[in-house]
């Protein structure tokens, strides 16, 4: 992060009365169509300016050069010192919440070359369509966010996963904000392709709430389709110091019903001195007075998880995941409202399936493109077939 070349990028949009040569791209809107302009012109009273900005809080994980530098500074150092234990005492790595810059409209300079490779067009020609409604907006937004998802999965997660496999260890962990369409757009433009690059696909479940089945069913669907036996949840964070084992059992069983079979309890601190005690409690360590009584709890979920991991869910119903529909309309400034016409009906559908106890999987279109086929009127994704 000390090197500005490594920092995350995002886009800022402004309407200005004059042309700004400092902008990444400047546009005008004419009869519902957006057009890129390269200088001041007569008859234009409003210039739509898009700026390339950076944030020093995180790195640009969409850039493979930066991912390789990260691996060299972390994983390679571990291997130099502890390589003999890789695949033995050191089983693997856990990655926590990798994301592009989530607080604005995400961007990476890598798009300047990758967009041309993918679409034979200049990404700057229509970049303003991310911010204004125009005839070109749906098509451009789809292409933009689909490529952002590809860069996220291939240039970060795929590279880390391949490094782990080549060094005899496994990779697990989770992405971030998995439980809504619009929050997935904040961070990665779709979580399901991420799970292809985990030895044990994982999800994060915070607090005491029981939501829709989307988050655990996304990860379990991908795991079943890709033949990955175990599905991890990092769970119980933000449940509070006054949470009871009975409540924890309810939270965990709901996730296990929806496809999870391995638990990572958040968290086990060395100390809770000072502010540490407020780090998303409760903690499942000797600092919690009833932790010693959790053996029965842990044994139950260990045995249940073993049974589920060595079984296969019979889910004949496949729901095509609508994240690609969200690409067409997502506008970071309008956030949830911009994809509400897709998100709300999807949530209603999920709730109805859950209430009726209908087992189902989600089909991500990128995974379907790679692993899907149709035979005898049945759709197959990897190892799962739907009638």
Where do the model's predicted regions map?
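Mature N-terminal, pre-catalytic/accessory segment of carbohydrate-active enzymes
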Residues: 1-96
């Amino acid at each position: 992060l000390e090197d500005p070349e490594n920092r995350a990028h995002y886009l800022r949009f402004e309407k200005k009365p004059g042309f700004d040569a400092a902008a990444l791209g400047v546009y005008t809107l004419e009869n519902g169509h957006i057009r890129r302009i390269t200088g001041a012109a007569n008859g234009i009273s409003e210039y739509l300016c898009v700026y390339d900005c950076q944030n020093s809080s995180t790195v640009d994980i969409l850039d493979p050069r930066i991912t390789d530098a990260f691996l060299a500074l972390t994983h390679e150092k571990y291997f130099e010192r502890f390589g003999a234990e890789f695949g033995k005492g050191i089983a693997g790595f856990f990655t926590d919440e990798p994301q592009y810059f989530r607080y604005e409209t995400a961007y990476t300079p890598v798009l300047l070359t990758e967009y041309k490779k993918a679409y034979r067009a200049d990404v700057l020609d229509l970049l303003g369509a991310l911010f204004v409604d125009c005839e070109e907006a749906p098509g451009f937004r789809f292409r933009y966010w689909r490529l952002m998802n590809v860069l996220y999965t291939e240039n970060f997660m795929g590279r880390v996963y391949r490094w782990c496999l080549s060094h005899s260890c496994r990779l697990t962990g989770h992405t971030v904000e998995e439980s809504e369409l619009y929050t997935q757009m904040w961070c990665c433009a779709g979580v399901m392709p991420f799970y292809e690059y985990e030895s044990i696909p994982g999800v994060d479940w915070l607090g005491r709430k029981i939501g829709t089945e989307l988050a655990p069913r996304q990860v379990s669907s991908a795991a079943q389709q890709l033949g990955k036996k175990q599905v991890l949840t990092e769970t119980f964070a933000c449940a509070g110091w006054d949470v009871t084992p009975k409540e924890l059992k309810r939270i965990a069983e709901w996730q296990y019903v929806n496809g999870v079979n391995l638990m990572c309890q958040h968290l086990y601190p060395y100390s809770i001195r000072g502010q540490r005690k407020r780090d998303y409690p409760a903690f499942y360590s000797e600092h919690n007075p009833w932790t010693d009584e959790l053996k029965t709890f842990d044994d139950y979920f260990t045995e249940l998880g073993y049974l589920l991991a060595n079984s296969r869910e019979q889910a004949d119903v496949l729901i095509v995941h609508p994240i690609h529909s969200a690409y067409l309309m997502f506008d970071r400034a309008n956030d949830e409202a911009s994809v509400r016409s897709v998100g709300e009906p999807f949530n209603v559908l999920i709730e109805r399936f859950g209430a009726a106890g209908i087992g189902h999987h989600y089909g991500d279109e990128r995974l379907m493109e790679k692993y899907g086929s149709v035979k005898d009127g049945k759709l197959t994704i990897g190892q799962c077939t739907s009638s």
